[in-house]
Amino acid sequence: MQKHYHKLISYLCDFLEKETQKRGFKKVVYGLSGGLDSAVVGVLSQKVFKENAHALLMPSLVSMPESKSDALDLCETFSIPYTEYSIAPYDAIFCSYFKDASLTRKGNFCSRLRMAFLYDYSLKSNSLVIGTSNKSERMLGYGTLFGDLACAINPIGELFKTEVYELAQHLNIPKKILDKPPSADLFVGQSDEKDLGYPYSVIDPLLKDIEALFRTKPIHLETLTQLGYDETLVKNTISRIQKNAFKLELPTIAKRFDPK
């Protein structure tokens, strides 16, 4: 297992280096939240680009204090250059304009605001934006379109959350980041498990079987329940995948009109 992850780390570092060079960049930038996924991307990026890998810390009005402190500790431990841009003032303006906005609207606004800061920094510093969404999130559509899902390249987009966790252990990510419950930190009390209804340890095996069995054909509930999965889990997961599939697609462009 140790050898497998040594090869995976080498593969992902090679991916980052080649794909960044292919696009004509020498520097990268990414959002560092204090969570597991961005910590893994941050350490991988630092391995490849050293001081040319820059992290942006972008706390909102409702970001947990430990999110920022964990991100800062990671930067210190791995010598990661960073800049902090508080999005709290913009968050406050949105909330003052839209007093009845749901938690989802507020969270999506903050997610897209962070991506705006990342792409502004990208332009200013000629850096490529690196994504931090894992495969579990991508399959379930558990992310904000043109927010945290937006990026130029993503080294962990084909790793399920449980695989990212194992990779993080081999990268020596601090224990307090490893141990904290996964959360997008978009509103007080949020956690991935509360939003999704199940922990990733339960969801990921199902997602792996769905990908293996139904990559090119419709998903069948009966096939999955026969494998021993709980019917409610399967129904909820299939619903999320189908409902949010559009988030992984490029915009559909109308074909050129021919008046003849």
UniProtKB/Swiss-Prot annotation:
Organism domain of life: Bacteria
One GO BP: NAD biosynthetic process
Molecular function GO labels: ATP binding; glutaminase activity; metal ion binding; NAD+ synthase (glutamine-hydrolyzing) activity; NAD+ synthase activity
Pathway noted in the entry: Cofactor biosynthesis; NAD(+) biosynthesis; NAD(+) from deamido-NAD(+) (ammonia route): step 1/1
Residues bound to ATP: G31, L32, S33, G34, G35, L36, D37, S38, T132, K161, S183
Binding sites annotated in the UniProt record for deamido-NAD(+): R112
Short name of one Pfam family: NAD_synthase
GO cellular component, one term: cytoplasm
SUPFAM superfamilies for the chain: Adenine nucleotide alpha hydrolases-like
Xref: Gene3D superfamilies: HUPs
Enzyme Commission no: 6.3.1.5
Enzyme class: ligase
Keyword list, A-Z: ATP-binding, Ligase, Magnesium, Metal-binding, NAD, Nucleotide-binding
Residues forming coiled coils: none
Reaction it catalyzes: deamido-NAD(+) + NH4(+) + ATP = AMP + diphosphate + NAD(+) + H(+)
Keyword Signal: no
Positions contributing to Mg(2+) binding: D37, E137
Keyword Nucleotide-binding part of the UniProt annotation: yes
Assembly description: Homodimer.
Family to which the UniProt record says this protein belongs: Belongs to the NAD synthetase family.
Function: Catalyzes the ATP-dependent amidation of deamido-NAD to form NAD. Uses ammonia as a nitrogen source.
Name by which UniProt lists this protein: NH(3)-dependent NAD(+) synthetase
Provenance organism: Helicobacter acinonychis (strain Sheeba)
